[in-house]
Amino acid sequence: MALERTFSIIKPNAVANNNIGAIYARFESAGFNIIAAKMLHLTKEQAEGFYAEHKGRPFFDGLVEFMTSGPIMVQVLEGENAVQRHRDIMGATNPDNALAGTLRADFADSFTANAVHGSDAVESAQREIAYFFAADEIFPRS
């Protein structure tokens, strides 16, 4: 296994439902170090830029609207095999298909309001981390 970084978002519904602490506790219990974190409220332009790969898809406008509907938490997680392990604890994108005990099974409200986002590959993690964090905002602890 390799020490990796992955990017994570706690989405507006989970922030509004006061689930930040519970989700952070799950990250730390799973062996992740949270090496960068901040709360922000995305502008339409920021959301469209972040999700640019989905532009033109039927769900794009709804996703942008949801992601700009309230504050989010963005964080960088570091740990062994971080990208895949984070995806495993998030659960299936559709919370109806998420295994019990996963973040989406426990905190999602719907397919769009599915509580969390996580990078799908090391390369996308690097791109997503750089979208929200400068190098001097990341503090490795390992």
Curated annotation (Swiss-Prot):
It catalyses: a 2'-deoxyribonucleoside 5'-diphosphate + ATP = a 2'-deoxyribonucleoside 5'-triphosphate + ADP; a ribonucleoside 5'-diphosphate + ATP = a ribonucleoside 5'-triphosphate + ADP. It comes from the Bacteria. Its EC number is 2.7.4.6. PROSITE patterns: NDPK (PS00469), NDPK_LIKE (PS51374). It is found in: Cytoplasm. Its cofactor is Mg(2+). Keywords: ATP-binding, Cytoplasm, Kinase, Magnesium, Metal-binding, Nucleotide metabolism, Nucleotide-binding, Phosphoprotein, Transferase. The keyword Kinase applies. SUPFAM superfamilies: Nucleoside diphosphate kinase, NDK (SSF54919). ATP binds at K11, F59, R87, T93, R104, N114. GO terms for molecular function: ATP binding; metal ion binding; nucleoside diphosphate kinase activity. It holds the Pfam family NDK. Transmembrane segments: none annotated. GO terms for cellular component: cytoplasm. Homotetramer. Belongs to the NDK family. Major role in the synthesis of nucleoside triphosphates other than ATP. The ATP gamma phosphate is transferred to the NDP beta phosphate via a ping-pong mechanism, using a phosphorylated active-site intermediate. This is Nucleoside diphosphate kinase. It comes from Yersinia pseudotuberculosis serotype O:1b (strain IP 31758).
